[in-house]
């Protein structure tokens, strides 16, 4: 089985480190081949890669900055990521020969919600924070239970 793990980074932040450990564990299992697609690669692991392009690197930075700027108009100070903008990762994923996609921490405009709806491969989600439940916030302030509604 070929698995593609997708995360913003492989080593930058707790969720990234956890996703990377899962990727390494999967590669230790016979009959499983795991790769990891990231925006920000910090390891020397040959099975971790990004779509290497100066243009794409600048686009990710610009989209992330724009997303942060848009969040300033929200009266909520919780850390958030809207993931409005489409990603070049979508085309790569859909044209690949992976059997399963594992979505980890895809915030900072790694993949948009619309991109996820266009995936043509089976995927699973590994939750590293509350973003998947809250829609844009990474976690909620204590006592904030609006996400339950």
Language-model region placement:
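Short, intrinsically disordered, charge-balanced linker/junction segments flanking boundaries
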Residues: 111-117, 144-149
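Short catalytic/ligand-binding loop motif for oxyanion handling, primarily in non-cytosolic enzymes
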Residues: 12-14, 43-47, 109-112, 131-142
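Short N-terminal targeting/anchoring amphipathic segment
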Residues: 90-111, 122-128
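Short, conserved clusters of charged catalytic residues that mark active-site
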Residues: 17-21, 84-85, 110-114
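A conserved catalytic-core segment of Leloir-type glycosyltransferases
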Residues: 30, 35-100
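N-terminal subdomain of nucleotide-sugar transferases
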Residues: 1-50, 96, 117-122
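Acceptor-binding helix/loop patch of EC 2.4 sugar-transfer enzymes
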Residues: 63-76, 125-149
């Amino acid at each position: 089985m070929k698995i593609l793990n997708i995360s913003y980074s492989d080593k930058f932040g707790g969720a990234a480190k956890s996703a990377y450990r899962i990727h390494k564990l999967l590669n230790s299992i016979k009959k499983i081949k795991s790769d990891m697609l990231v925006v920000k690669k910090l390891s020397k692991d040959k099975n971790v890669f990004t779509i290497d392009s100066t243009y794409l690197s600048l686009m990710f930075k610009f989209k992330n900055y724009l997303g942060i700027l848009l969040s300033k108009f929200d009266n909520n100070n919780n850390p958030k990521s809207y993931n409005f903008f489409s990603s070049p990762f979508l085309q790569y994923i859909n044209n690949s020969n992976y059997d399963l996609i594992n979505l980890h921490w895809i915030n900072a405009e790694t993949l948009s919600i619309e991109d996820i709806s266009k995936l043509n491969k089976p995927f699973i989600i590994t939750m590293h924070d509350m973003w998947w439940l809250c829609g844009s916030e990474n976690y909620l302030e204590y006592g904030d239970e609006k996400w339950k509604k």
